[in-house]
Amino acid sequence: FFAEFNTIQKKYKKILDDNQINYEEGGHTLNKFFNAKEVVKSPGVSNNSDIIVKIKSKNIPIISEIEFAFRFTNSILIGVTGSNGKTTTCSLIHHILKSSGKSVGLAGNIGNSFSFLTAENNFEYVVLELSSFQLDDVIDFNPFISIITNLTPDHLERYDSNFQSYVNSKFKIISNHSSSDYFIYNNDDDKI
């Protein structure tokens, strides 16, 4: 089931219809959420929004679209987050891999969603631009290579003006790393 508070674009309605996925637009019917086993939340929806608070009160798991897509990919993931430079870094990595003949996709906060990319393609590598909002609701997500470009006070309205909460969201990119994964960061940034 898919719900959109606004109007769903025609091209996405066609995808939903073609895959026999029920949907609603222009609002949310709470009972439909309350019957869900899990909710995949758009990163633009705050964890403090009324609907999310109500869903959480029913102990229904809420995950991000990034977490959802992660369950269905075998691609080697390179995740990039930070306050500035994400798009440039992702574009450069994508260009380098593509120029070297690798099968590589680009998704997340740049281009298509990770879910759409995963459903439509089978790339060897996927470069993901990841905002703090996209990382807020990850559970098992684990890129093989994680990059944090830098950290500056940004989007603090989403984090109750708490910079450390914002930093914690960014560091979720490595929360499931093991000794076989890689973490690249800006050593000159004293916030990392």
Regions found by a protein language model. Give the residues of each.
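Short beta->alpha connector loops at strand-helix junctions that form conserved
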Residues: 3, 26-27, 66
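Glycine-rich, highly charged phosphate/nucleotide-binding loops
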Residues: 17-32, 167
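Phosphate-binding loop of NTP-binding sites
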Residues: 30-36, 43-187, 191
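NAD(P)-binding Rossmann-fold cofactor-contacting core
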Residues: 1-14
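Short, conserved SAM-binding/catalytic segment
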Residues: 11-21, 120-121
